[in-house]
Amino acid sequence: MRNTMNLTNLLAPWLDCPELADITVQSLELDSRQVKQGDTFVAIVGHVVDGRQYIEKAIEQGANAVIAQSCQQYPSGLVRYQQNVVIVYLEKLDEKLSQLAGRLYQHPEMSLIGVTGTNGKTTITQLIAQWLELAGQKAAVMGTTGNGFLNALQPAANTTGNAVEIQKTLADLQQQGAKATALEVSSHGLVQGRVKALQFAAGVFTNLSRDHLDYHGTMEAYAKAKMTLFTEHQCQHAIINLDDEVGAQWFQELQQGVGVSLFPQDASVKALWASSVAYAESGITIEFDGCFGQGRLHAPLIGEFNATNLLLALATLLALGVDKQALLDSAASLRPVLGRMELFQVNSKAKVVVDYAHTPDALEKALQALRVHCTGHLWAIFGCGGDRDKGKRPMMAEIAERLADHVVLTDDNPRSEDPTMIVQDMLAGLTRADSAVVEHDRFSALQYALDNAQADDIILLAGKGHEDYQVLKHQTVHYSDRESAQQLLGISS
């Protein structure tokens, strides 16, 4: 049963409006196009759009009331009517949105785990949810690959949805029996206060490397945004990757910190660390030690960074009191995440690994991880997104040339930019222009690699991962790296 509240009570922490008590709020909506009869429209000044421009449209759609961000003309506390629909103004509404939505949808009584960092968020949230399910606790995720239970994810437009969507989704998940939800928390989401009112049982920091500089401007601003999960949000435990330079620095400053490392730490440090790690085609075997005692686990995942991801997920669940033996016994049943170092293979052809790596750091880690498993030549196929940080294009090409034996440059959501110009930016990072082949069509790029690779080669198809679209200048078309790999290898999906 969906919660309802009268408008007076909803606004009570900020405004005294007894005259609004007869207006029932049953659902909040930020997008005027999505307003249905009886919804309450919330008009905030967003990063790109000013929602107040769409008040009239929302009323025409059937909004029963409007809560709008105040301005000089309409100060906070003002109540006015338009076409017999009440509009009430509230200052800094964009900052209050998470709390406002939380009051209506009731802060869900479940364990919330927030995961932030440049890379690894999706894998860690899904490992946490998988592991909890294996331990007998119903768990959900919210993030890049969708929201909900792992066997029934609903598509998500952004890594971290808007503040209203988050509260609404959490209330729905709780109603469906979720005892815990692991959320990917993006830097955009933190800066814009989308998770401001959530109480996190644990926060996890994965790593920090170049990304989203088109939004944040500098690495310092980007790091500061990530740090707020632990300093400005309610976060009981902070699980920090000590092998990341920024993480090691933050760990010194956070009282609630639990460190995680692939290298032995001093016994006085509150941390979980690997005493030995073994990589094989069947997966990763880790022996660990530290503040949660000793243990050994095996999981069918590939690569050094997945050893870190496993330990971060393990430390989080141990900090939350999940039984250690239950976690170690079930680790072998964990599964790779869709489009994250996902292996496609058949006899007598090169292996294809599909991964979401679309930053310099992620590409470097993916290639280094595969080199350990590769007995033949290593191939890298990737592109760079249009209308995004141009500085990373030559960096990614330099990494591919250095770490792979063969490089194929292709398109990856060129958006409004000319794909040939994006490739030119990438080529600038190469020491030799002839060390890369250019094939703009991703399917053809993979076909070229498979035609020229030997059976013991590994082909990394990087950048899109779980995505099933390609964003062009005037349209978005269906395209999937996973489907391309299955089709070209003759694997039935």
From Swiss-Prot:
Pathway participation: Cell wall biogenesis; peptidoglycan biosynthesis
E.C. code: 6.3.2.13
Catalytic activity: UDP-N-acetyl-alpha-D-muramoyl-L-alanyl-D-glutamate + meso-2,6-diaminopimelate + ATP = UDP-N-acetyl-alpha-D-muramoyl-L-alanyl-gamma-D-glutamyl-meso-2,6-diaminopimelate + ADP + phosphate + H(+)
InterPro entries (alphabetical): Mur-like_cat_sf, Mur_ligase_C, Mur_ligase_C_dom_sf, Mur_ligase_cen, Mur_ligase_N, MurE/MurF_N, UDP-N-AcMur-Glu-dNH2Pim_ligase
Binding, UDP-N-acetyl-alpha-D-muramoyl-L-alanyl-D-glutamate: L30, S32, N158, T159, T160, S186, Q192, R194
Keyword Ligase carried by entry: yes
Record-given protein name: UDP-N-acetylmuramoyl-L-alanyl-D-glutamate--2,6-diaminopimelate ligase
